[in-house]
Amino acid sequence: MYTTAVIDEIRQQVRQWRASGETVAFVPTMGNLHAGHITLIKEAKQRADHVVASIFVNPMQFGKNEDLDAYPRTLAEDQAALTAAGCELLFTPTPDIIYPKGLDAQTFVEVPGISDELCGASRPGHFRGVATIVLKLFNIVQPDVALFGRKDYQQLLVIRTMVEDLSLPLEIVGVETVREASGLAMSSRNGYLTADEKARAAALKAALDALAMQIGAGTAIDAAITEANAALVTAGFRPDYLEVRSATTLALPTDADKELVVLAAAYLGKARLIDNLVFSR
């Protein structure tokens, strides 16, 4: 695997592949990789001739009091994991390469509506930062397909919407959430959990499972949400939000919506954990 922070080197290699009629898959990450990221790389290998990944801790998507400085940087370990998984090209830019004029003078991308709720309401400007960096990386790499984890369900829909609205010529693939044996969704932020908190963190997925079963059995959505929130508080969480939405639009569900998604964000110790579950009723 070749690692570079130089935009022109990425473009030159991709052009060579394309000149040979070969396809390119892209997996953008913020590093500190876990099994979920490696699953994305392996799926990417099934969908294209070549796999490109990026590692960039994007300052534009972090709020003033969030964990930008504390976010783990583990480049050597990440390079080894990506190489073993079959990634061929790794882009590792610095903020001054991505945002040479600084964040305040940077052109940005905003996906209205879907970016403003749930995580967007809790983290103002977050999805502006996500959409901007993802579009910039797409312009640099020019992939045929890009892969994202379904754990970040709202992010996936924001990116799909951006790609559709801007007529970008690539496919967006959502890959199923990879979980630990307890059911906890794998996340780079799980490293913030103490051993005791990690044991209790499985209650998040359990609450989503119970809520989906209740709604499927006919329980009113509001009543099921109230019970799930109570279960999270009992387990030691501080819920940020727990909501049921249309699985396709993230709009509040109507009686006609049969495919639903429950989305949750909750604090446990220093960690803000998110998870979701798509279900039918």
From Swiss-Prot:
SUPFAM superfamilies: Nucleotidylyl transferase. InterPro entries: Cyt_trans-like, Pantoate_ligase, Pantoate_ligase_C, Rossmann-like_a/b/a_fold. It is an enzyme of class 6 (ligase). GO terms for biological process: pantothenate biosynthetic process. Its EC number is 6.3.2.1. Keywords: ATP-binding, Cytoplasm, Ligase, Nucleotide-binding, Pantothenate biosynthesis. CDD domains: PanC (cd00560). ATP binds at residues 30-37, 149-152, 178, 186-189. It catalyses: (R)-pantoate + beta-alanine + ATP = (R)-pantothenate + AMP + diphosphate + H(+). Beta-alanine binds at Q61. The keyword Membrane does not apply. One of its GO terms (cellular component) is cytosol. Signal peptide: none annotated. GO terms for molecular function: ATP binding; pantoate-beta-alanine ligase activity. Pathway: Cofactor biosynthesis; (R)-pantothenate biosynthesis; (R)-pantothenate from (R)-pantoate and beta-alanine: step 1/1. Pfam families: Pantoate_ligase. Homodimer. This is Pantothenate synthetase. The gene is panC.
